[in-house]
Amino acid sequence: MNSPDTPTKITLDWKASEEGLTPHLLVGSIEQKVAWAAQEGGQRAFLACHLPEVLAEGNRGASKTDALLMDFAQDCGQGYGAEWHGMLFRHTYPQLRDVVVKTQKWFPRIFPGIRFTAGNQLVWTWPDGEFLTLGFFSRPEDFRNYQGFSIPWIGFEELTNWADDTCYKLMKSCCRSADPRVARLARQRATANAYGLGHNWVKRRFRLPILPGRTVGEIIRDSYDREGNLEEPRCAIHFDLSENKILLAAQPDYLNKVKAAARNESEYRAWVYDDWDIVAGGMFDAVYQPKVHIVPNFPLTRIPESWYIDRSYDHGQSKPFSVGWWAESSGEPLIHNGHVYGQVRGDLYRIAEWYGWTGEDNKGLDLVATAIGRGVLDREADWGLSGRVHPGPADGSIFNKDASGKSS
């Protein structure tokens, strides 16, 4: 028998049941089945992290969504009432279905008396008044629905669905509370897989990948916003399918299903291995294969006269611009260092690019159109292509004028 000064030992065990693998708490000699418990690894680290901004990242099936929901729920029933409330976003409304299903599975089991309202908004309301709204945020224009709100808990599910960080950063201005008890809890949380339209900006923001063998990534304390203000600290936390005992007990072959569903090598490596070093975020991800589409460089002066060379232009001034040079094969082959190019008429090669940026994300060179034009001609002369390059497509913004009459 323990003495009064000896703390009661509490342990967690997982046992098979008709409902699947379920958690059991052993408090001293008393065992009690519980509705939900954080699993070892990413889930526990995520729920214990007190930084104002945290990303749960990992491969498919790693239990990130459950952790996101419980991150909000763990502060319900603590006496804050309606002051503690949150907003969980998916990119589109249909994508909310999976979140709704998971909340309907867990919340009524854990919180007796909780109510779900499915009207103009999808809202879970706790008996003490706390509430979580499920919504979608497709475009920056949707921010007008939330501008001026105080929302102490904000979640983004599948963050790489957003092509850039605009929507994510807009909501940071709403992550606050006038109640000092709740203000100290205010936080922004997100989940993500590698791959998707937003792969690159999410990778940059959270400095992914996390070093192998680590669960918690670098705590980022040296990041500044566009105005030069120091941002709040943030980090990423790694989740892995191998940690999800519940899913693997119910579906031991789940990983094989993920492998079979992947449409290309990049998607496969992202979903199976959580590989952030893949090429992702573009229109052609589903068909892009580096072994096929990347070839060794060749001297541009060796391009046969029968090939057609032109250039494309994606305009930017305060934002980056891109000039692309293309060579289309006539069917006459080009042979260089044992490699044969252009054997098929119509083969298209991106032979060069001038990307006009400062080296800072999304920051252009602020060059006027005439300076860009001179830069194009200078480069063509350096490459030995003067007089060979035909004009090609350019986006319509080249005709826009600012107040001074200059192209913007």
Residue ranges: model-predicted function:
Residues 157-159:
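Walker B catalytic acidic pair
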Residues 84-95:
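Conserved RecA-like ASCE P-loop NTPase motor core of nucleic-acid helicases/translocases
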Residues 65-81:
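Walker A/P-loop NTP-binding motif
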Residues 335-408:
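Mg2+-dependent endonuclease catalytic cores in nucleic-acid-processing enzymes, primarily RNase H-like
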Residues 243-315:
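ATPase catalytic-site recognition across NTP-hydrolyzing enzymes
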Residues 161-246:
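ASCE P-loop NTPase helicase motor core
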Residues 95-152:
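Inter-Walker segment of RecA-like/P-loop motor cores
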Residues 1-53:
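Pre-P-loop entry segment of helicase/translocase ATPase cores
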